[in-house]
Design a protein with these regions (language model features):
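Conserved acidic, metal-coordinating active-site core of Asp-based
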Residues: 60, 64-66, 71-184
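Active-site phosphate-binding/coordination module
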Residues: 1-93
């Protein structure tokens, strides 16, 4: 009583481990690196990437052979090449099954992301080429004023709304629940 339990993860909601989602008393989940806040599986807030930023991101990668992923409302959509051969693109062996279990195996991710540009929680760019990742990161930071960029592994560049991060989502949830941060 009086305690709110919140799980936070970079994963989209449906990819959260059962061991986390079955925690007795779990009230909220902050997922997709803070872009989504859910209560009992129902989305209560989403911080979407601006559609114009999605197009700028796609413009930045247009000439590069990179793997793209998109998170939409709790689901992962990934380039079919990555899903079928994740180790070839730097996926760590412990994430192999997670990667293979994504919900959308997309042949043309650029077209998919463009078509769904109004509903994206997060975009990941995956490449084993560090110089390419750094160039793309710099290019996207210059082109997009309304995004937050982070990395979870050496091969990932993760892009979300500037309104999204796990810390910002926790602040948003505390404000919504009228809980001061000193109580977190």
């Amino acid at each position: 009583s009086g305690i709110t339990i919140v799980a936070a993860s970079g994963r989209p909601f449906v990819m959260m481990p059962d061991s986390v989602m079955n925690i007795v008393g779990l009230d909220y989940a902050i997922t997709s690196n803070g872009a989504v806040i859910s209560k009992c599986g129902k989305t209560v807030h989403r911080s979407l990437i601006l559609p114009e930023d999605v197009l700028k991101i796609l413009g930045a990668v247009r000439n590069d052979d990179v793997i793209l992923e998109g998170f939409i409302d709790g689901f992962t959509y990934a380039d079919v090449r990555y899903v079928h051969r994740p180790l070839d693109y730097g996926c760590e062996p412990e994430y192999f099954e997670y990667t293979r279990s994504c919900h959308g195996k997309i042949v043309d991710m650029r077209s998919f992301l463009s078509k769904h540009r109004n509903e994206l929680d997060l975009i990941s760019i995956i490449s084993t080429d560090e110089k390419l990742r750094n160039r793309l990161l710099s290019s996207i930071e210059k082109a997009c004023n309304s995004v937050e960029i982070t990395t979870s592994t050496d091969h990932f560049v993760e892009i979300m709304s500037a309104e999204a991060s796990k810390a910002k989502a926790l602040l948003r949830l505390c404000d919504f629940l009228n809980i001061g941060m000193e109580n977190v």
